[in-house]
Amino acid sequence: MSLGVLAAAIAVGLGALGAGIGNGLIVSRTIEGIAAQPELRPVLQTTMFIGVALVEALPIIGVVFSFIYLGR
């Protein structure tokens, strides 16, 4: 097994781990905010979805970069 494959696997794994932790924090804080102020639910949900999308973009970029690196 080459070192490049190991590096790509670590990059993808750490990216997924970070995204999972980030998504959990975003959703938990959104639920706390909705419980505290239910009238702000639409605004908080919209902000949550934007935040989750941004957090999920990073692991996808990591996968793309690892494929590019392995293609060399």
Curated annotation (Swiss-Prot):
GO terms for molecular function: lipid binding; proton-transporting ATP synthase activity, rotational mechanism. Its main location: membrane. F-type ATPases have 2 components, F(1) - the catalytic core - and F(0) - the membrane proton channel. F(1) has five subunits: alpha(3), beta(3), gamma(1), delta(1), epsilon(1). F(0) has three main subunits: a(1), b(2) and c(10-14). The alpha and beta chains form an alternating ring which encloses part of the gamma chain. F(1) is attached to F(0) by a central stalk formed by the gamma and epsilon chains, while a peripheral stalk is formed by the delta and b chains. Keywords: ATP synthesis, Cell membrane, CF(0), Hydrogen ion transport, Ion transport, Lipid-binding, Membrane, Transmembrane, Transmembrane helix, Transport. It comes from Bacillus caldotenax. Pfam families: ATP-synt_C (PF00137). InterPro entries: ATP_synth_csu_bac/chlpt, ATP_synth_F0_csu, ATP_synth_F0_csu_sf, ATPase_proteolipid_c-like_dom, F/V-ATP_Csub_sf. CDD domains: ATP-synt_Fo_c_ATPE (cd18185). F(1)F(0) ATP synthase produces ATP from ADP in the presence of a proton or sodium gradient. F-type ATPases consist of two structural domains, F(1) containing the extramembraneous catalytic core and F(0) containing the membrane proton channel, linked together by a central stalk and a peripheral stalk. During catalysis, ATP synthesis in the catalytic domain of F(1) is coupled via a rotary mechanism of the central stalk subunits to proton translocation. Belongs to the ATPase C chain family. The chain crosses the membrane at residues 1-21, 48-68. GO terms for cellular component: plasma membrane; proton-transporting ATP synthase complex; proton-transporting two-sector ATPase complex, proton-transporting domain. It comes from the Bacteria. The gene is atpE. It is a multi-pass membrane protein. The keyword Membrane applies. The lineage of its organism: Bacteria, Bacillati, Bacillota, Bacilli, Bacillales. It is found in: Cell membrane. This is ATP synthase subunit c. The record marks 56 as: Reversibly protonated during proton transport.
